């Protein structure tokens, strides 16, 4: 059956989201059709605001609605420690455990030669520039425990070690092949406690 164009376009839009296939997209589109108009308008406004009002912090590259972000601006945080993560979602996961009080650096990816992603394609040059600040004493590498995450961790370690800054890696309380954003607070907390020097 051919859907009316507005529904077909909405289904198409939902299918652009990761993990959403044609059946789920269709269910979502028909759910939206049944929503109250005010709720649909609020939802549409939220989608537009995400694109218009959010940016990346010029210091740590986390998502933010202020620049620098609130974490970078927080004078109560430990400026001597930087936790390096792959994605902005990982910062949210780390913050949920409420045990890490340092700063962050978001790479926006991992080194993956198979996908043509090298160190210059992610925020590694920006990290090295940040490390020229004499206050930094430790870099915690919290990339995902995947082949790409491990390759990125080793690359960062080789770059940072000669500077005399301590480089540690979070412990693998996290499943190999898993993503930080899906880990619970206890698992993340144990992984941070068991971090090791690289």
From Swiss-Prot:
CDD domains: TOPRIM_recR
All residue ranges annotated as the Toprim domain in the record: 80-175
Residues that span the membrane, as ranges: none
Presence of the UniProt keyword Zinc-finger in the record: yes
Keywords: DNA damage, DNA recombination, DNA repair, Metal-binding, Zinc, Zinc-finger
Signal peptide: none
GO MF terms, alphabetically ordered: DNA binding; zinc ion binding
BP-aspect Gene Ontology terms: DNA recombination; DNA repair
One Pfam family it belongs to: Toprim_4
PROSITE patterns recorded: RECR, TOPRIM
Zinc finger regions, C4-type: 57-72
Protein purpose: May play a role in DNA repair. It seems to be involved in an RecBC-independent recombinational process of DNA repair. It may act with RecF and RecO.
Similarity annotation: Belongs to the RecR family.
Matches recorded under HAMAP family: RecR
Name of protein: Recombination protein RecR
Source species: Halalkalibacterium halodurans (strain ATCC BAA-125 / DSM 18197 / FERM 7344 / JCM 9153 / C-125) (Bacillus halodurans)
């Amino acid at each position: 059956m051919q859907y009316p164009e507005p529904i077909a376009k909405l289904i198409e839009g939902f299918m652009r989201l990761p993990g959403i296939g044609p059946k789920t997209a269709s269910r979502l589109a028909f759910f939206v059709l049944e929503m109250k108009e005010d709720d649909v308008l609020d939802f549409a406004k939220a989608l537009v605001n995400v694109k218009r009002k959010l940016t990346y912090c010029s210091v740590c590259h986390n998502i933010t609605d202020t620049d620098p972000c609130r974490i970078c601006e927080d004078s109560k945080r430990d400026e001597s420690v930087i936790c390096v993560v792959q994605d902005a979602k990982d910062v949210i996961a780390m913050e949920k455990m409420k045990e890490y009080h340092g700063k962050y650096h978001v790479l926006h990816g991992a080194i993956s030669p198979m996908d043509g992603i090298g160190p210059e394609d992610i925020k590694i040059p920006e990290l090295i520039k940040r490390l020229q600040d004499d206050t930094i004493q430790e870099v915690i590498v919290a990339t995902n425990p995947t082949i790409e995450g491990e390759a990125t961790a080793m690359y960062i370690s080789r770059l940072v070690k000669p500077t005399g800054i301590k480089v540690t890696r979070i412990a693998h309380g996290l499943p190999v092949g898993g993503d930080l954003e899906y880990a619970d607070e206890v698992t993340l907390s144990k992984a941070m406690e068991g971090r090791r020097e690289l």
